[in-house]
Design a protein with these regions (language model features):
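Alpha/beta-hydrolase active-site loop
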Residues: 95-119, 329-350, 365-369
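N-terminal cap/lid segment of alpha/beta-hydrolase-fold proteins
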Residues: 24-48, 239, 245-285
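The feature captures the conserved acid-bearing segment of alpha/beta-hydrolase catalytic domains
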Residues: 44, 162-221, 280, 392-445, ...
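Primarily recognizes the serine-hydrolase "nucleophile elbow" in alpha/beta-hydrolase
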Residues: 114-183, 345, 353-411, 416
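Histidine-bearing beta->alpha loop at or near hydrolase active sites
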Residues: 87-88, 231-238, 323-326, 451-457
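Short, surface-exposed "cap/lid" segments of acyl-processing enzymes
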Residues: 46-77, 82, 280-315, 319-322
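Post-His helix in hydrolase/transferase enzymes
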Residues: 238-253, 334, 459-471
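Acidic beta-to-alpha connecting loop that harbors the catalytic carboxylate
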Residues: 56, 205-207, 232-234, 293-296, ...
Length: 475
């Protein structure tokens, strides 16, 4: 690098000051502090937001330059959370964790932010970053499971980051240590083999910090990544007419993408009010229909992976997003009535006589309450239920406390399992998952199944699907 990112950031501030004089940038509507992010600055759209943006600053911190850019997005209907990368990375380095995995931090921030601000319906967030923040949002998207983020927009991207801790192995992103005079100064990220969402990078052709030829070569190695070249732009982004139109166009392309890989374009009227995603069966369709309640992260990594594996074996899946569903308060009886609607509609629509129910994490916690309250006709359709990573209590509403680690108002799951009605159920848990209630299951209709890994089962989606299919009754 020819110049430091911090010096260039100060140049950008001078350019942004002109924008302030024209009334583009404004003070944040509020601040709050959350976990290792520290103080987060909030910029709201005039109406109910259409998108949520997690915007990470460069090495200069959350200053006028990134503020002006955040304000541009509020005019487009976004709610923007401004993050100071200096504070975040400092807290990451101070933590007791041996390696770095950032996707879960940004996911938790999005959940907390939207609940705290009273967003009516949960919105899948978009990641945006400038300079070192551009690098961080790329790495976060690369390690995130599909469905967590809409995508990421990087402004002034370099593939290196001043991060001393190593990146966690198996997280989807790889990096090599960056040494200067024999001392570890950071990491150099490698091109990701795949990304979980759309990534667009704005690249100044006269950027003397993140050189265009090297950056372009890096990005072109990543499937689906897109680079937007800016002929008259360096690393400072000071002259608005040279980058603002491309910036807003890139943001629009990311947020216009459908977040789910295979959703039903329009759900049928009987279930149109529910957050469902249809995963069609591939090849020869079986006699079984699966309804899958996701974990509290929404219809994302494990849920999508297991559903895709089942679809390969001919089982069509109705995916149910627990994050969006329980964003509004629910009751066991009300949730059971909604499940009844789903079972009756799709069993009739797809001509299926047998239903496989699956729940993961929060979906597993709540599913026993729903099954035990199903009407007799729907109950008779259920041939097997698989509970993945069930805990000892269930919550039927998203609470801020869930993401602060001090939730204590859940309903015990043990009594529901003890009074389980109908067909048998699988209680599948990872051997490292200390919070699972499956290990205590003895007798009754439950079949404990121990698998490798922890709460996320080490990403072994095919193995989970195979275990479930192995127990399907031969009807």
């Amino acid at each position: 690098m020819t110049f430091s990112k911090t010096v260039i950031a100060s140049v950008w501030v001078l350019g942004a000051a002109t924008s302030l004089a024209r009334g583009v940038a404004a003070a944040p509507t509020e601040h709050f502090s959350y976990a290792r992010f520290g103080e987060v600055s909030i910029y709201r759209a005039a109406s109910e937001p259409r998108d949520v943006v997690l915007f990470v600053s460069g090495d200069g911190g959350w200053n006028l330059g990134v503020v002006a850019m955040a304000e541009r997005l509020t005019a487009a209907g976004a709610l923007v959370a401004g993050i100071d990368i200096r504070h975040y990375l400092a807290q990451v380095e101070k933590s007791n964790e041996k390696c770095v995995s950032t996707a879960v931090d940004f996911e938790n921030l999005s959940h907390y932010l939207q609940a705290k601000l009273g967003i009516k319906h949960y919105l899948q967030p978009t990641l945006i970053g400038y300079s070192s923040g551009a690098t961080l949002v790329y790495a976060t998207l690369a390690e995130a499971p599909e469905g967590l983020f809409k995508g990421a927009l990087s402004i002034g991207f370099c593939p290196d980051l001043d991060l001393i801790k190593p990146v966690c192995k198996g997280s989807g992103i790889e990096a090599l240590p960056r040494l200067e005079k024999g001392k570890l100064k950071g990491v150099n990220f490698l091109p990701a083999k795949q990304l979980s969402g759309k990534w667009i990078s704005l690249q100044g052709q006269i950027d003397q910090v993140c050189l265009a030829p090297q950056t372009t070569q890096f990005i072109e190695k990543i499937p689906g990544a897109e680079i937007v070249t800016l002929p008259k732009v360096g690393h400072g982004y000071s002259v608005e007419k040279n980058w603002v139109p491309q910036y807003l166009a890139a943001y629009t392309r990311i947020t216009a993408l459908r977040p789910d890989a295979t959703p039903a374009p329009v759900l049928p009227a009987p279930v149109a009010d529910l957050p469902l995603t249809i995963v069609p069966a591939l090849g020869n369709s079986s006699a079984w229909l699966a309804v899958f309640l996701s974990g509290d992260g929404g219809w994302a990594g494990l849920d999508r992976g297991v559903a895709a594996a089942l679809a390969k074996h001919g089982v069509a899946v109705v995916g149910w997003d627990s994050l969006k569903y329980f964003w509004s308060p629910r009751t066991p009886a009300g949730a059971a009535a909604d499940l009844d609607r789903v079972l009756r509609h799709y069993a009739r629509e797809w001509n299926k006589a047998h239903v496989l129910l699956i729940g993961y994490s929060q979906g597993a916690d709540t599913l026993p309450f729903m099954v035990n309250r199903l009407p007799a006709n729907s109950h008779e359709l259920v041939g097997l239920t698989a509970l993945l990573g069930i805990s000892d209590s269930a919550t039927f509403e998203f609470h801020l406390a869930n993401w602060l680690g001090n939730a204590s108002d859940g309903i015990p799951t043990a009594p529901e399992l003890a009074h389980w009605k109908g067909s048998r159920y699988l209680c599948i848990y990872g051997e490292e998952d200390l919070d699972s209630a499956c290990a205590q299951q003895t007798g009754g209709l439950g079949i404990p199944v121990k698998m490798a890994g922890g709460h996320h089962f080490g990403g072994s989606y095919e193995a989970i699907a195979a275990e479930i299919l192995k127990h399907l009754p031969n009807l």
